């Protein structure tokens, strides 16, 4: 454990208070023009504004100054795990999130379906975000075309939209390495990269990846839009200290997308079933309400604030923020002792990608001070009395506000 996590573990105590952590994925943004507003500031959010007026605000750097967090490191940081110490690839998170069991030596990989043009140039890294039904159809094609490579069993799984997972099953006594460069260049207008092993133990896996990419393009050659694959986030089986053991909290995850459910599962949270598709807002509220008495801590995830930012759709990201604002009163009706609203990273529509900008943080509790803030925005958060903090500081703050930490020292 990191020093802070180990210290908190020694101070944590069980109480009846409840903590609700709302993660608006990628919520931080940028104005489109010099004097413009961010997506958060543009959105009409009367309920978030009212909550901000009863709260303390601040900012979090999830990994470190200038470092752009992936979703995995961003969430680990929010949960109190040092993301530089506890490292996991997106492949394992997605695999575990959809219920795939990984064995020692296996390697899981997160894939994107992509659109390739002449000369294999990437036209769209997400293939137009195909429907889940189309995703399943493409996965079936790949399963039929690539059941194994050089004696290594290959399993392909659907995730959602453009996302899929591939698991390479290690032969007996021959563990596969996962230290490999990404195939996904994360930009358009260039060819997919060649996977390169970063250590000798990963050379076989890199060869498997490159062979899969080539065979997939052959298998999908008749597809007008979903005709290529991009890989990133290779991972073997990760192990983390138990969230419950560290914080004395019985914790539940309410999320729709497999990667986030996978991460919650890996740290020991119970993943609650959610009715509905995509962000399934009402289904999430229902899951929260029906399980409120059973848990001390709830992780409540909203995805589309991130997806719309990655699409560069400023107006739609504003709309998704406003949809959450309409939902917020139903969360507050449950009267959590502590509620936090935060992002796992920023995803400005202007950049169409994750960014290094700090994420705005709001904490309301019965024992917290109030800031003069009028709204939950990046600008108000930058002036907040919580200041600019490292991501793993969040959980101790929530625990303290819930009166779940004993005093340190005499």
Swiss-Prot record:
Metabolic or biological pathway: Carbohydrate degradation; glycolysis; pyruvate from D-glyceraldehyde 3-phosphate: step 3/5
Pfam families: Metalloenzyme, PhosphMutase
GO annotation, biological process: glycolytic process
NCBIfam families (UniProt xref): apgM, PRK04135.1
Function: Catalyzes the interconversion of 2-phosphoglycerate and 3-phosphoglycerate.
Family: Belongs to the BPG-independent phosphoglycerate mutase family. A-PGAM subfamily.
Protein name, per record: Probable 2,3-bisphosphoglycerate-independent phosphoglycerate mutase
Lineage: Bacteria, Thermotogati, Deinococcota, Deinococci, Deinococcales
Gene name tied to this protein: apgM
